[in-house]
Amino acid sequence: MKRFLLCSFALVLLYPAGIDMYLVGLPRIAADLNASEAQLHIAFSVYLAGMATAMLFAGKIADQSGRKPVAIVGAIVFMMASLLCSRASEGSLFLSGRFLQGVGAGGCYVVAFAILRDTLDEHRRAKVLSLLNGITCIVPVLAPVMGHLIMLRFPWQSLFYTMSTMGIMVGLLSLFILRETRPARLAPRDLSPSSSAAESLVNRFFVSRLAITTLSVSVILTFVNASPVLLMEVMGFSRGDYAITMALTAGVSMVVSFSTPFALGLFKPRTLMLVSQGLFLTAGVTLSLAHTNTVTLFGLTLICAGFSVGFGVAMSQALGPFSLRAGVASSTLGIAQVCGSSLWIWLAAILGISAMNMLIGILIGCSIVSILLIFSVAPNRSVAEHEEIPYQSRS
């Protein structure tokens, strides 16, 4: 079991590392490529577009050919794309590399969740996904610090050499440590009507959890995207103050994420999901009424706590019905989360909504819609039946 957890954690970490590692070098990258920082900020959206593109195909391929091949190919693509970024001499080539980085990270991300669905029951999966969320929160703290230390002595290209090395390490783990977890496919005659209905992507319960997780990811990505404007322009923080504040909020996320597995032993998953959305709603109201930096920071802290306590539980519930189509389900969740959050951020920018109002709007909208879905759509009885994997591959 430890090998599956190790490999899943490593596969997931490529995604946030690809976002956060290079940001500290953005001014120098822009200068060397004769591009403005504003032009290169589109690299974030390009990276997410690459992830979404990979997710369109990775899940189905993982269900048909296995988790291991997709993980290996994803790591190789991430490694080679990182090298392409390091060799870029102009903006378009750099953005192409960022897109391919997203493709590699997206494939690995999908496989990681499919592996956890294959190997863990619902109760353990919810705990592990909460821990995974906590570990993921470490990356936004450590990656900029690591990037800063690297750039004290080396050029910005070294940031992408580091990411390339990460891709190599994940590829080696996938090749030599990871075992195939894809369950053996049942013949059509062996699939009962209830099984087919439960593993349908238009299943009412799955759609509700897809909506909840997509809205939750939209909240946290809106926070990350808006945080430089909120903290440095609106609140007047220096770059150092901004880094410290983001480190503290990430610390809150880690503490709550690592505490959630213990909370699951005391409370029902639905209770934690309601607490999560309650924290989002409280954060939205707090930010809308805030007149001091202290109150605003308290509201931002509630966002991190709310996401950490509920996201892993909701993801576990969403994957629960899928024993044979975990890859496709994981892809669908990833695509919805990436595209949904990107659409909201893009739409808010087009409409000229301020960073604060953008954040308040998604917080209140997410909490109201999610609370209604949690109360109105309960887990199907058949979900528990599909927690068991019919046949486990030993390859």
From Swiss-Prot:
Belongs to the major facilitator superfamily. DHA1 family. MdtL (TC 2.A.1.2.22) subfamily. CDD domains: MFS_MdfA_MDR_like. One of its GO terms (cellular component) is plasma membrane. It is found in: Cell inner membrane. Residues 1-3, 63-68, 114-130, 179-216, 268-270, 316-332, 379-395 are cytoplasmic. Residues 25-41, 90-92, 152-157, 238-246, 292-294, 354-357 are periplasmic. GO terms for molecular function: transmembrane transporter activity. It holds the Pfam family MFS_1. NCBIfam families: PRK10473.1. The chain crosses the membrane at residues 4-24, 42-62, 69-89, 93-113, 131-151, 158-178, 217-237, 247-267, 271-291, 295-315, 333-353, 358-378. The gene is mdtL. It is a multi-pass membrane protein. SUPFAM superfamilies: MFS general substrate transporter (SSF103473). This is Multidrug resistance protein MdtL. Keywords: Cell inner membrane, Cell membrane, Membrane, Transmembrane, Transmembrane helix, Transport. InterPro entries: MFS, MFS_dom, MFS_trans_sf, Multidrug-R_MdtL. It comes from the Bacteria.
